[in-house]
A protein has these predicted regions:
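Periplasmic-binding protein-like
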Residues: 31-32, 106-114, 185-226, 243-244
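Flexible hinge/capping segments at coil-to-helix
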Residues: 114-132
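Short helices/loops that flank or line small-molecule/ion binding pockets
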Residues: 67, 72-84, 100, 125-126, ...
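Bacterial N-terminal signal peptides
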Residues: 7-20
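Short amphipathic alpha-helical coupling segments at ligand-binding clamshell hinges
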Residues: 48, 52, 123-126, 177, ...
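Extracytoplasmic small-molecule ligand-binding "clamshell" domains
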Residues: 23-93, 97, 155, 220, ...
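Ligand-binding clefts/hinges and TM-proximal coupling segments of bilobed small-molecule sensing domains
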Residues: 63, 139-156, 192-195, 225-244
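A ligand-binding cleft/hinge motif common to bilobed small-molecule-binding domains
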Residues: 89-98, 143-146, 172-201
């Protein structure tokens, strides 16, 4: 009787979906202020990338505990074990040397912000000889240094300083993440900044782990990401955030 009972119990668990009660928990660090992708509000992580990652994790049988920190501390959270992974990080050749990435969660990129009512520059070449500011924490500084050496690049601390230097006239333009820059310009500097409509650099954002570690986690999340793209969940999330 006992073997029969155990066999039945095993078969029940085999057909049960991986709900949060049975799911493996992973800790994911993110920039505490990176709207609309990820930010910490009232002790809760939210954003477009957060919703997408949560949906993919559910498909993969994973539960995520978020660890919001200042961007400059993200690498440290992986090194000291506070987090298993970090997101949303832009995939570029430099980061591929130290991180392994999932499939992209969302596509973003760099854009140029100028003082209103000036029109948006038509790319970096239009800013030859002019001062462009960008935060040190992102991938845009390296790209500008390599591809537009004729630009007077000033690397600063963060988005707040970038906007301050732009609006004070210290800089002619600010090179910022397209969505993040637009969100902050709209909420903090309404009417003072021309909102760009195009990217000068396209970048995919993904979840990252330290190189050579947690390949199983990457594989599981890749399957989850593929699943939510196939069943329309990804598009529904993107549409919801686009309407905000």
């Amino acid at each position: 009787m006992r073997p029969f009972f155990l066999a039945c119990l095993a078969s029940v668990f085999a057909i049960l979906p991986l709900t949060p009660a049975f799911a493996e928990t992973i800790r994911v660090a993110h920039d505490q202020r990176f709207p609309p992708f990820a930010e910490s509000k009232d002790g809760k992580s939210e954003g477009l990338a957060v919703d997408i990652l949560n949906a993919a994790a559910q498909k993969a049988g994973l539960t995520i505990v978020y660890v919001p920190v200042p961007f400059e501390q993200i690498q440290r959270t992986l090194d000291d074990g506070r987090a298993d992974a970090a997101f949303p990080l832009a995939i570029n050749p430099e980061r591929r040397q130290t991180f392994d990435f999932t499939a992209p969660l969302v596509i973003t990129g760099g854009a140029l912000f100028v003082r209103a009512p000036q029109p948006s520059p038509d790319g970096l070449k239009a800013l030859t000889g002019k001062t462009v500011v960008t935060p040190k924490t992102g991938p845009l500084a390296g790209f500008i240094q390599k591809t537009a050496p004729e630009v007077k690049l000033v690397v600063n601390a963060d988005y707040d300083q970038s906007f301050a230097q732009l609006l004070s006239g210290e800089a002619d333009a600010a090179a910022l993440n397209f969505q993040v820059g637009r969100r902050l310009a709209t909420t903090l500097h309404a009417g003072k900044v021309t909102l760009p409509e195009k990217l000068f650099l396209e970048l995919p954002l993904a979840l990252a782990v330290r190189k050579g570690e947690k390949s199983d986690l990457i594989a599981r999340l890749d399957k989850g990401i593929a699943a939510i793209r196939a069943d329309g969940t990804w598009q529904a999330i993107d549409n919801r955030w686009a309407g905000r």
